[in-house]
Amino acid sequence: MSSLHTIELGETGSRVVFLHGLFGQGRNWNTLGKQLADKHRVTLVDLPHHGRSPQPDTFDYLEVTAAVAELLSAEDPVTVVGHSMGGKVAMLLAITRPELVAKLVVADMSPVVYERVGGFKTYVDAMQSLDLDSVSRREEADAGLQEAVPDQTVRGFLLQNLRRDGDSWRWAMNLPVLGRDLDQIGDWPADELKAYEAYDGPVLWLAGERSNYVTDEYAPAMKEWFPRYRKVTIKGAGHWVHSEKPETFLAALRQFLGD
């Protein structure tokens, strides 16, 4: 049994597993998950290094993927929904363990190497430089991040990881490793995948109109690994498509699931 922390919603119907992005946690999907739970069994996963799941010494996509695979069974293949980093994990799960994945949904991520991860490094540095011993209220932590992270929505997202631990605060994610291994998080393990075939199941790609993570430049790689994919661009959305346009995201997901 996998040691990953999960939240389970719903009691009947096909199973849908949600994988969050960098600095996220399973509960980021809580609102969407509850809405789907009327017709599906929903699993919200804390990926390694995040939330209440284990925090290994290094970040490795295939190890993360293997940990998610331990949650699943070939007798009950699932729809996997992954955003950003979780999108890469979802793609790798479909490629390396296709018997576990009935359908795949990728939210604003492509099967490519991303060279520019500087923005995420800024977030890591800001969180690590925050003196949590001097923080008594969450509002003080928010103020401490404001200069480095001026976007209030992003700050709110990051601060969801701030947890009370007795009389003090701590970050509920593996900041030292995530900060050090950002290049690996931007990577795509092409060499390790040479022994695998393309995933031949149905794939829905949900791209943010204002994001540059899914572009025409990446279409050949998407087609190579996922020949049955269909791309939907969500108007007005940036990278966090599911939180910026939740109703549109949910409608596209329900249609794909056949609800």
PLM features per residue range, with description:
Residues 92-95, 100-137:
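Flexible "cap/lid" loop of the alpha/beta hydrolase fold
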Residues 5-54:
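Conserved HGGG/HGGXW glycine-rich cap/lid loop of the alpha/beta-hydrolase fold
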Residues 167-225, 230-233:
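Conserved serine/cysteine hydrolase catalytic core
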Residues 20-22, 82-87:
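Conserved alpha/beta-hydrolase "nucleophile elbow" surrounding the catalytic nucleophile
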